[in-house]
Amino acid sequence: MPIGVPKVPFRSPGEEDASWVDVYNRLYRERLLFLGQEVDSEISNQLIGLMVYLSIENDNKDLYLFINSPGGWVIPGVAIYDTMQFVQPDVHTICMGLAASMGSFVLVGGEITKRLAFPHARVMIHQPASSFYEAQTGEFILEAEELLKLRETITRVYVQRTGKPLWVVSEDMERDVFMSATEAQAHGIVDLVAIE
C-alpha cells in the first residue's frame, strides 16, 4: 500500500500529455490553498509564496484558503493575514474542522462576504500566549510589552473585521471561546455557513 501524498494526472495548458503531480500541486494550480496544521514559519512562508505567485499569475481570479488548524505562532499567522490583505485577488477563507487561535485570525482575514464555515466546524479565539516562561526578569518584561502590542493589534483586527465593539472582542479574548459555525457567523468571524 503506497504511503504519502497521492499523485494525480495534470495537463498544463498547451501540452498534449498529462504529467503526474502530487494532489496539493494540482489543487494549488486551481488556486486552492490549505492550512491544515499548526501555524509556523514554514507553512506561513509556503502560503505567502503561493498567494504572491498566484496573484502575479492572475490578479483577477480569486484564491480559496481552506483552514483546519489548531493555531500556532503569532508572527507567522499575522504574516499570512497581511499577505491576504496585500494580494490583489480576493481570498475566500473556508473553515473545515477547526480554526483555533491563529487559525481563526487567518479565517477572519478572508474577504468580507467570502468567509465560510462548514456546518460542523469549530472556531476558537483567545489572547496570544508567551513562550518565555523561564526567561530572566528583563527579558520577561520586554516579552510582556511585545505581547501586549500583539494582543492590541489582533484585537483591533477582530473589531474591524467582525464589526463587534472593542469591549466585546477584548472580553472574549480573555479566555478560550469556542464557537459553532453558526455562532462564528453571529460573531462576524464568518459570513456564511455551508448547508449540510
From Swiss-Prot:
The keyword DNA-binding does not apply. It catalyses: Hydrolysis of proteins to small peptides in the presence of ATP and magnesium. alpha-casein is the usual test substrate. In the absence of ATP, only oligopeptides shorter than five residues are hydrolyzed (such as succinyl-Leu-Tyr-|-NHMec, and Leu-Tyr-Leu-|-Tyr-Trp, in which cleavage of the -Tyr-|-Leu- and -Tyr-|-Trp bonds also occurs). It comes from the Eukaryota. PROSITE patterns: CLP_PROTEASE_HIS, CLP_PROTEASE_SER. Cleaves peptides in various proteins in a process that requires ATP hydrolysis. Has a chymotrypsin-like activity. Plays a major role in the degradation of misfolded proteins. The active site is at 101 (nucleophile), 126. GO terms for biological process: protein quality control for misfolded or incompletely synthesized proteins. Component of the chloroplastic Clp protease core complex. GO terms for molecular function: ATP-dependent peptidase activity; ATPase binding; serine-type endopeptidase activity. InterPro entries: ClpP, ClpP/crotonase-like_dom_sf, ClpP/TepA, ClpP_His_AS, ClpP_Ser_AS. This is ATP-dependent Clp protease proteolytic subunit. GO terms for cellular component: chloroplast stroma; endopeptidase Clp complex. It is an enzyme of class 3 (hydrolase). It comes from Eucalyptus globulus subsp. globulus (Tasmanian blue gum). SUPFAM superfamilies: ClpP/crotonase. Its EC number is 3.4.21.92. Belongs to the peptidase S14 family. HAMAP family: ClpP. It is found in: Plastid, Chloroplast stroma. PANTHER family: ATP-DEPENDENT CLP PROTEASE PROTEOLYTIC SUBUNIT, CHLOROPLASTIC ATP-DEPENDENT CLP PROTEASE PROTEOLYTIC SUBUNIT 1. The keyword Plastid applies. Keywords: Chloroplast, Hydrolase, Plastid, Protease, Serine protease. Its main location: plastid.
